[in-house]
């Protein structure tokens, strides 16, 4: 009887120690890998990749705010199509990125409202998305397909 009780207690103790172990962090996929899947899976117009310098010019995003990024915009000037994937360096930077992308979205809506009403509608239905430290903006006619790919990686 004593051996059985000792065995049960030892087993419970082992489970307690095992559950206290450090949990493995999920592997962070490169945002360029996510962008490659988006571009290969979704029908997009001719897109131009953005550099870190372009991020500063287009969105006011400083290099120190992000640890990884992938971004592209429509190569022509009359059709609004943007996919921006950013990984913030910390929570404060993530909040700053959300604000900057929201400002960009508001500016795009104001710009398109009088010139291209159909593009205005596309911009108005777009939103900035956050998944932990990953912040994204998707302005696209195929936004649902792109969001499904993002869900696969970040949900």
For each feature predicted by the language model, list its residue ranges:
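A short acidic-to-branched-hydrophobic micro-motif
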Residues: 80-90
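Bacterial signal peptide processing site
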Residues: 21-23
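Short Gly/Thr-rich strand-loop-strand
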Residues: 91-130
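Positively charged n-region of N-terminal signal peptides that target proteins for export
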Residues: 1-4
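A short, solvent-exposed beta-edge/loop patch
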Residues: 75, 118-155
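Sec-dependent N-terminal signal peptides
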Residues: 7-13
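C-terminal motif of bacterial Sec signal peptides marking the signal peptidase cleavage site
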Residues: 15-19
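Short, compositionally biased low-complexity segments enriched in polar/charged residues
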Residues: 48-79, 92, 96
